[in-house]
Amino acid sequence: MARRGKKKGRAVSGWLVLDKPAGLGSTEAVSKVKWLFGAQKAGHAGTLDPLASGMLPIALGEATKTVPYVMEGAKVYRFTVAWGEERSTDDLEGPVTKSCDKVPVEEDIRALLPRYTGLIMQTPPQFSAVKIGGERAYDLAREGEVVEIAAREVEIGRLDLISIPEPKKAVFEVECGKGTYVRSLARDMGRDLGCFGHVADLRRTEVYPFETQQLVPLKDLEGAAADAETESDRFSALDSYLLDTEAALDGLPEIVLGDDAAGRIRLGNPVIVRGRDAPVQAPEAWASLRGRLIAIGMVEAGMFKPKRVFGL
């Protein structure tokens, strides 16, 4: 019987709130971080376009089990729309497909914003990761295929006009839910204003529950790794940038366990929830032992039932 090979890398776990530089793809960024930390596992919580900069939460080790909770969180973007041109990629990267000399005025732009707030239908860009017949839309688009992508419902909490730095450019900030494409937003606003438009600059500033002040530039990680004299020093310096795995679970009730209950949970068994403030019912909650995440599960009739156990 073949033996399972030993996993390569360190069993390091936690969240890194990376400030991704423009020009680097999300998958490349994850690979870079995984290599720097020598981690066994790594994954991100929501693709950020290569031309975009900003917040890319990256999960290491056991934290990858909490990625879905961050994926569902609200996101905030600051972006610049260049009016007068529509491009194949809906950003600066693609060739111009339509153009117009009209320049929208501030009054018309502001009047348009309520139309893009709340639940709206949005069609993803041709160059997107949406799957069409089992293939990514961007792969089909690169082959010259124009594909029909179905519109989908997305939620926009707010869309604000921040400034108009020059007549043909406007800066916006949007808070939106999962699946929203800022490039589609720019394209659609341009069409509604009768002047076309594309994203000229894009930065993600927040991914709930993480905050701007938690951002770590890639160059800081590379500098910390380069300055370390030993591998031990390197990993110690890098690990100081990590947030605890449970940082992704903000908003879920915490069930505080003792040693005996934690032992039962680790074996996949339910336990009675104790404590004056403990919930009797909760569709999702996380259990902790001395502040460390043990499991995610549900509380039903005063019992915590684990769904996912962590090896932290």
Swiss-Prot record:
InterPro entries named among the record's database cross-references: PsdUridine_synth_cat_dom_sf, PsdUridine_synth_N, tRNA_psdUridine_synth_TruB, TruB_C
Keywords noted in UniProt: Isomerase, tRNA processing
Catalytic activity: uridine(55) in tRNA = pseudouridine(55) in tRNA
Active site annotation, chain numbering: 49 (nucleophile)
Gene3D superfamilies the record matches: Pseudouridine synthase
Domain of life: Bacteria
EC nos: 5.4.99.25
GO BP field: mRNA pseudouridine synthesis; tRNA pseudouridine synthesis
Gene Ontology MF annotations: RNA binding; tRNA pseudouridine(55) synthase activity
HAMAP family, per the entry: TruB_bact
Family: Belongs to the pseudouridine synthase TruB family. Type 1 subfamily.
Protein function: Responsible for synthesis of pseudouridine from uracil-55 in the psi GC loop of transfer RNAs.
Name the UniProt record assigns to this protein: tRNA pseudouridine synthase B
Native source species: Chelativorans sp. (strain BNC1)
Phylogenetic classification of the source organism: Bacteria, Pseudomonadati, Pseudomonadota, Alphaproteobacteria, Hyphomicrobiales
Gene coding for it: truB
